[in-house]
Amino acid sequence: MLEFFMETAPTTTTGLPLSAILAIFFSFIIGIVFGGMALFVFRGFIMNRQLRIAQRKATKMLADSKVEAKDVLVEAKREADKARNSAEAELKERRSELAKQENRVMQKTEALDRKLENLEQREQSLTNREKSIDETQSQIEEIRTAELKRLEEVASMTTEQAKSSLLEMLEGEMQQETSRRLREWEIKIKAEADEKAREIVSQAIQRCASDVVTETTTNVVPLPSDEMKGRLIGREGRNIRALEQATGVDLIIDDTPEAVTISSFDPVRREIARQALSKLIIDGRIHPARIEEVVAKAKEEVEAAMIASGEQAAYQAGVHGLRPEIIKVMGRLKYRTSYGQNVLQHSIEVAQMSGMIGSELGVNVTLARRAGFLHDIGKAVDRDVEGTHTQIGADMVKQWEKSPEVIKGVAEHHFDTPTVSIWGFIVSAADAISSARPGARRESLENYIKRLKALEEIADSFKGVEKSFAIQAGREVRIMVKPEEIDDLGAMRLARDIVKKIEDGLEYPGQIKVTVIRETRSVDFAK
């Protein structure tokens, strides 16, 4: 057929016959059709194959799932059995525990029942005993009332009188017992305290060697002759008035041969007047202008001497780093005395003693020395400022010292404050050692006699005292008491009361011994 088309078909411009072209076209179409059919068949084959593979996989997965499900089911059954067994065991254990608790509760209930029964029995017994006791007490009260009536009839005393007598007797016995025990404790405590104090003081004294100082400020200036008295007085007394006005002292020119007495309460003024008067006597030129010049120069020399004395005293006391104001004020104490004892030398001794006592007690030695050295600084200005020298000194030290320990030592060394620290006790002990040793201090005859009379008046003011005597220069008081009014224990109380009144009402150096003497004499005659 193709050949027919090829033979009969006309030719084209390309030279190929139309039939050839149609043959090629039909061949191409047929190839496409057969290729599509082949492709469809092949694709169907492939799809069938994949389908079979998928079916096999699905079958396998289904089988595996069944196996796995079976395993899971078996495991679940096993876990369920295990949980059931555990629950059954726990339930069994709880039932057993509940049974035990029930048994215990029953036992406790039985025990409580028994106790309740016992309590009821005891209550009944106590009720019976209470009735018996009430009956017995009633009988005793009746017997007591009867006996009291009989005693009142026999003793001719009422009940209140008997009670009063018994209380008085008991009070006397208790007072005697209390006094006896107080005496025993007092002896014991004093012995222990004295032993410890002796140890500390002896250690301090062994390490300190100080001079005995009893000097006083010079009040009398010697004159080369009595003619100098007239020159000192001057025409119409102008020289002596100028000298008294420039120095602030009183010059006493009396019948005492070749001597002029300087009188003033201010030791510094007294020293300035002494030096100025000595220079005027040596120079010989005595007139108001010269007096003013010499007095001004004497003031400068005394101030320089005070500073030098203060520095020297601080060096001897082992106290360093003091401010110039303190040095100058301490130098004034060179011209200040207390009961005849030079206060500056006393301050040096107290500083040394305080340091040694502080070292024995284990405190700061430097601060102890400093407090001891400054403890009497208030005496340098106590004539110009109101207050005790401890208050004045504490106020002055607060301005220049930062250490509270030093301030406490100055303020508390006379126990003027409500509380006393260890620094106050250290300085007080050192002050007592320096001032109370023999020869350290002395007092005027007038003050001495007043103190003796005051001691005897204090002792005589107590009931039962017959006579008192102040002896040993006022360091001991002996009291004679009436034996019918004061017994032995009362004598102890009397001594303690007198000591307390002396401590509260008198100022004195050192310590005063109080001795109470009770004498009983029994006299009879043989016939």
UniProtKB/Swiss-Prot annotation:
It is found in: Cell membrane. CDD domains: HDc (cd00077), KH-I_RNaseY (cd22431). It is a single-pass membrane protein. SUPFAM superfamilies: Eukaryotic type KH-domain (KH-domain type I), HD-domain/PDEase-like. Residues 217-302 form the KH domain. Residues 343-436 form the HD domain. Its EC number is 3.1.-.-. GO terms for biological process: mRNA catabolic process. One of its GO terms (cellular component) is plasma membrane. Residues 83-117 are annotated as: Disordered. InterPro entries: HD/PDEase_dom (IPR003607), HD_domain (IPR006674), HDIG_dom (IPR006675), KH_dom (IPR004087), KH_dom_type_1 (IPR004088), KH_dom_type_1_sf (IPR036612), Ribonuclease_Y (IPR017705), RNase_Y_N (IPR022711). The chain crosses the membrane at residues 21-41. It is an enzyme of class 3 (hydrolase). Keywords: Cell membrane, Endonuclease, Hydrolase, Membrane, Nuclease, RNA-binding, Transmembrane, Transmembrane helix. One of its GO terms (molecular function) is RNA binding. Belongs to the RNase Y family. Endoribonuclease that initiates mRNA decay. This is Ribonuclease Y. The gene is rny.
